[in-house]
Amino acid sequence: MYTRKTLETEIAVELRRGGALQVETPIPFLTHMVETLLKYAGLGGSVAARELRRLDDGHHVIEDVAIALGRALDALLGERKGIARFGWAAVPMDDSFALAAVDLGGRPYWAVKAKLPDVSIGGYPLRMFPHFVRTLAAEAKATVHIYARGADPHHKVEAAHKALGLALRQAMAPGESPSTKGVLG
C-alpha cells in the first residue's frame, strides 16, 4: 500500500492484478475516471482520497491521487521483468475517439493531445487532465502518449482513460520485456 499525506490531502492506494476495486475521492468525476482507468487496466485494490483543506478547485486532490497511483503502479511493476512492456489501444466512445500508447520501460515521458474546454465536470477541471497524465507517467516511470478527439468533453476524457487502461493492461501482460540494451530504464 502506498500512502501520501500532506497538509491538503490524505491518499491511500493499494493495487493488485485483478480482483475487486473500490475508489473513493471527494471529486465525483475523478472517482469515475480512476475507476475506469484501473478497471480497464485489469487492476484491483483500493484508492481512498480525502481532502483535508480545500485550497483550490481540486488541483491538489487530483495531483496527489496521480502521484499515489503512479507510485503504487511503479511498486506493483517492481523490476519490470517478465512483462510485455509496450501497450496501445484505440477506444471509440460515441462521438469520441482516443488512442493511448505506453512503455513501462522505466523512462518517464508524457504527451497528451486533446482539445478540452476550460470547464469542470463533476468537480474535475478538465485542464487538469494533461497534468494528471503527466504526474501519473512521471511517478510510474512510464512513457504515456494520448490522443483524444470528440465533441463531448466527458466522452473524450473517459475514452482516453479507457484507452490508457487497456494499453497498461497490454503492457503489464506476461512477456519478454524487450530491450536491445538488456536492461530497462
Swiss-Prot record:
GO MF, one example: imidazoleglycerol-phosphate dehydratase activity
Pathway connected to this protein: Amino-acid biosynthesis; L-histidine biosynthesis; L-histidine from 5-phospho-alpha-D-ribose 1-diphosphate: step 6/9
Catalyzed chemical reaction(s): D-erythro-1-(imidazol-4-yl)glycerol 3-phosphate = 3-(imidazol-4-yl)-2-oxopropyl phosphate + H2O
GO cellular component: cytoplasm
Keywords from the UniProt entry: Amino-acid biosynthesis, Cytoplasm, Histidine biosynthesis, Lyase
The protein's enzyme class: lyase
Enzyme Commission numbers on file: 4.2.1.19
Record's keyword annotation contains Amino-acid biosynthesis: yes
Listed PROSITE patterns: IGP_DEHYDRATASE_2
Main location: cytoplasm
Protein name, entry field: Imidazoleglycerol-phosphate dehydratase
